[in-house]
Amino acid sequence: ISASLVGSEMCIRDRFTIGQASIEIEGDIYKTSTVDILVTEAVSSSLSPNNPDTIVSDDLELIAEVSKRSPYLNEPISVVYKLLFSPKINVTNLSEIDAPDFKNFWSQNIKIPRLEINRTSHNGKSYNYVTWKKMLLYPQKAGDIDIDPMTLDVTIDVPTNRRDFFGNVIYSQTSNKVSSEKVKIITKPFPEENKPEEFNGAVGDFKIFAESNKSELSSNESFQVELKITGSGNLKLFSIPDLVVPSSLEKYDPEFNENVKVGLSGMNGSISNTYTIVPQFQGKYPIPSTEFVYFNPREKKYIKILSEELVVNIIDG
C-alpha cells in the first residue's frame, strides 16, 4: 500500500551525521560508512488516507431508510437501519448505544435472524452493509413527529501501511460512534369530509364475516356466533363492533381471538369475537348484519361493509 502527498513541502529542521564505527576481529579491523540523516517537520497523520480515523470518517455511515414520510394516522411505515462501510475495512463488533423511543408511534421490532454482509451503492460509492434493525411503526398523532437518531458503537479493523514478516497487511483496530440522521414524519389526519360516526380508527383493507355454529336448536340449548374481521391494516389497534341480537336471545360477553402476523409491511390476519347465545322462546330469530367502517389510505376514503344476516330457528320452547 502506498500513499503520496500532493502539494506538500518537507521543511528540513536539521542535519545529523553518524560517524564511522570500527571493530577489530581476530586482528582485522572493520569500519562502517558514515550516514547522513535529514530531520524534517512531522507530516500530520490526518493527511494520510490510511490513517484509521480518516478511513472511519469517510467510509462508515449509519442510514435510516423510511418507507413513507407522509402517512395517514394508523397507516404503517417501516424504518430500516443499515450500517454502511467501505469494503477495505472489517467490522468486528457492533453495539447499540442510543435508540429512538418512537414516541407517538405504535412500534414493533421486526426480528433479524442474523447479521449478513451485503453490497450496495450509496451516493455514487460502493459499500458493504449490514441491516442492524427493522421497525414497523403506526403513527398515533397527526402532524410532525420526529424520530431521534440511533447511535452505534462500531469496532473495526483498518489497514495500515505496515506489513508483517510474511508481507501481509497489518490492521489497526479502532472504535467509533456513528449516528443516523433525525427523521421527520408528517402524519396526515383522517379526512373530515364524509367521515362516518361509526368510524373507530380502523385503517387498511378489510372484510367482515358472521357465522353461527347452529341454525336450528332447542330453547334449552346454546349456540355461538363468531364475528370476524380479516385483512391487512392496524388489526391490533381497533375494536370489533358489537354484535346486536334480538332481546329474546341472551348474549354473553364475547371471547376474543387474534391471529395476526406482523411484518415489515404491516399487520395482516384476523381478529374475532365469539359470542355464546342462549334462546328464551320458540321461533325464528334474525341476527342483523353488523356494520364495520374503515379508512382505506390507498383510495383515500371511508368504506362501509356489512356481515351476513343470520337466522336461527328455535324449534321448541
What are the residue ranges of the model-derived segments?
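Positively charged, low-complexity/disordered segments
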Residues: 1-7
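Surface-exposed interaction/ligand-binding surfaces
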Residues: 8-9, 13-317
